[in-house]
Amino acid sequence: MPQRFIVVTGGVLSGIGKGIFSASLARILKDSGVNVNILKIDPYLNVDAGTMNPNQHGEVFVTDDGYEADLDLGHYERFLGINVSRKNNITAGQIYYSVIKREREGKYLGSTVQIVPHVTSEIKDRIKTMDGDLLVIEIGGTVGDIEGEVFLEAVRELAFEIGREKFHFVHVTYVPYLRTTNEFKTKPTQQSVQLLRRIGIHPDTIIVRTEMPIDANSLFKVSLFSGVPRNRVINLPDASNVYEVPDVLHSLNLHKLIAKELDIDINDRFNWSYPKSFELLKIGIVGKYLGTDDAYKSIIESIYLSGAQKPIVIDAQELEDMTDEQIKNYLDDFDALIIPGGFGRRGIEGKIKAIKYARENKKPILGICLGMQLMAIEFARNVGKLEGANSTEFDENTPYPVVNMMESQKEVLNLGGTMRLGAQKTQIMKGTLLSRIYDGQEVVYERHRHRYEVDAEAFPQLFKNPGEEGYKLTISARSDFVEAVELDDHPFFVGIQYHPEYKSKVGKPHPIFKWLVKAAGGKIND
């Protein structure tokens, strides 16, 4: 059980960077010699994020142990340089499911099951099972959300039971700038802190998020009306690069203040290195989730951490109505393309057209999960002349099911948590570009999230092993399934069934993205 706790709450509105702040502070303390762990609490009733729409909630992040999580766990892994697990995320759905299950099993011995104490006790018990000496707890949403109240009550009770001196509460809030009057408005933050105090939680530190640096008088007002000392009201304006945040926090010495208050010994060593200059490469993600960049968060960050500027999301549906010439005119402007994972029929034909363009014009392209499957379909249609080739996901009656549902998935009825998930052993074939990318490693463990597979056995005319002759897709990685394909005589035509984006860390992006960036810059043989 952890001995010290930092609890991060949010105020005014969501999406203001609690996850980045929590990950940054945890990284600083980790580098300072503290055995730190981190936990994300999501108040939604979903058991996990696996069935959520990426347009609404952002990407689903997959851990090594096969848990489908909120994208904040991706921030934790990238910033801390660690691999988290399902234990690092608690949802309201998990808590209520567990409590109801216990009641049905008679574990409460006939008690009237209530929010307090039964639900709060379940939350506290899960927090107590976490590893590490110091636990950073990020509570999702904002203070005042009805679904989050039970979690705030649980951490309040925990602080009372264990000892308030072992807890440090950080409230991350937002102060808007009203351009019509040229002033910052602190009233929403004041009211947010008042709500928190009514619950029984008095913040020790307030992080004031703003679009631009705030004036000292506004910070004084936040301090005065919140009852938090001025030196603990800290402004964090928007950064052009989120990887600047740990440096900024470290310079503000917040970690020293917290360590002193929690009686933690630190050595104040901080080793933080991230890309500060970027190649001006235009890399396109041919996708279908356009509502937010968060839908492809880990891919975007992997490209960024590999030293290239932020990729652009291309609407796959727009490509569907274009001719080959129009697509060429449009995509010629890009240095490389990525076909990401996804589900459903929408935009599929546009992605296939983009793959055809990249194959014929030797444009560097990376297909991830569904992207690899579509590479096989495109090759079957346009090279193998198998008219109507498809995946049974999109056409159950296709005459050429190049992509089919895995046998183990055909009897599965529920959608949540039932795919082939998490780290799976993958054998890399010698003599392939993929083998060069992995620096000769023969076995790797990569994270998966899929129900469908490329059926190479049924269509041997389309695939070959490394070193064999003929214009076919080379199978460059295997498990019980086809894990990767590539194309000879092409600078970078690589499809992978797994998701390398989930394993990129600050200072250590996944090598597949580093090589894609090299190919985009024409440096594949450097």
UniProtKB/Swiss-Prot annotation:
InterPro entries, alphabetized: Class_I_gatase-like, CTP_synthase, CTP_synthase_N, GATASE, GATase1_CTP_Synthase, P-loop_NTPase
Binding-site residues for L-glutamine, renumbered to this chain: 342, 370-373, 393, 451
Binding residues for Mg(2+): 72, 138
GO MF entries: ATP binding; CTP synthase activity; glutaminase activity; identical protein binding; metal ion binding
PROSITE patterns (UniProt xref): GATASE_TYPE_1 (PS51273)
Reaction it catalyzes: UTP + L-glutamine + ATP + H2O = CTP + L-glutamate + ADP + phosphate + 2 H(+); L-glutamine + H2O = L-glutamate + NH4(+); UTP + NH4(+) + ATP = CTP + ADP + phosphate + 2 H(+)
Stretches the record annotates as Amidoligase domain: 1-264
EC numbers on record: 6.3.4.2
UniProt keyword Metal-binding present: yes
Keywords: ATP-binding, Glutamine amidotransferase, Ligase, Magnesium, Metal-binding, Nucleotide-binding, Pyrimidine biosynthesis
Family recorded in the similarity comment: Belongs to the CTP synthase family.
Other comment: CTPSs have evolved a hybrid strategy for distinguishing between UTP and CTP. The overlapping regions of the product feedback inhibitory and substrate sites recognize a common feature in both compounds, the triphosphate moiety. To differentiate isosteric substrate and product pyrimidine rings, an additional pocket far from the expected kinase/ligase catalytic site, specifically recognizes the cytosine and ribose portions of the product inhibitor.
UniProt name for this protein: CTP synthase
Source organism per UniProt: Thermosipho africanus (strain TCF52B)
Lineage of producing organism: Bacteria, Thermotogati, Thermotogota, Thermotogae, Thermotogales
Gene, per the UniProt record: pyrG
